[in-house]
Amino acid sequence: LGENWRMNRTLSRFAAETLYGTGYAPATDVIGRQRVVLAPPASRGLPGEEECVGWILDPAYPLVLCVLENVRTTVENPVEAALVARLTRALRERLTDPGSGEPYPATEEGDYLFWRHGLFIVSPHHAQIGAIRTHLAGVRAWEYPPFVDTVDKMQGQEAEAVIVSYGVSDVETALGEAEFIYSRNRLNVSLTRSRAKCMVFLPRPLLEPPLDLVQNEKAAAGLRHMLDLQEFCRVHGEERTFDLGWMEGAAGVRLTVLRARKM
């Protein structure tokens, strides 16, 4: 693989360094310079929410890893789903349509275009997809249904921004479906759908599994890709931890955010 006609420089660079080799780069300067453009926020969030959401969405940082600490759930992770919904609400209000330079209008057509070109949300598990859809319904009255689905449904698709939500934070569950949860190909496809911004949610236990996992060659390759993502964001950006006490049901939960800057 050489030229890439989709992703900006930061997103291409991660794929180049980890999988495709240094020749893999944006086909043109215009593609390489793509970034999301956000209008100023129309409404104020909860204290704590605004800062956390703003830090994750900052257009100057195209690749963001969000690691939830102190959460133990199996295939459905309500805290992660609620965070994804809040990020989505902020993007729906603020993300501008590259065609018009204006935020997507608050109409059925606006919702359709937002989910067609602006954002989609990827999750490996139907339980987590259901949890995200439930939380999305709670943050806004959508006139066109949100695009939340598995990576298989996203192949060949692209959007300005993508949110990837793994959800699974129970090690036994992850080990039971290791080749699925730790599929390097699935993670790679998820990471290479967006043109300008990719935000990945990985609960801490997935990044620190028991040693049994490395005996499975395919799963070990996927874990290595997750750890490479963490390292890439650390080396090329900055890290900050947020207390999620402002969220319902998230007492004691922390979110470590690593974001790789625009290259």
Enumerate the predicted regions with their spans.
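Helicase C-terminal subdomain and adjacent C-terminal extension
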Residues: 137-140, 171-263
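Amphipathic alpha-helical transducer elements in NTP-driven molecular machines
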Residues: 5-8, 12, 81, 85, ...
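Hydrophobic alpha-helical scaffolding
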Residues: 1-5, 74-77, 122, 180
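Short, surface-exposed amphipathic charged segments that create phosphate/polyanion-binding patches used
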Residues: 12-18, 40-43, 160-166, 257-261
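Conserved helicase/translocase motor-coupling segment
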Residues: 26-134
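Conserved helicase C-terminal RecA-like lobe
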Residues: 90-192, 201-209
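A short acidic, often aromatic-flanked loop/helix-cap motif at beta-alpha or helix-coil junctions
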Residues: 4-9, 33, 70-75, 153-157, ...
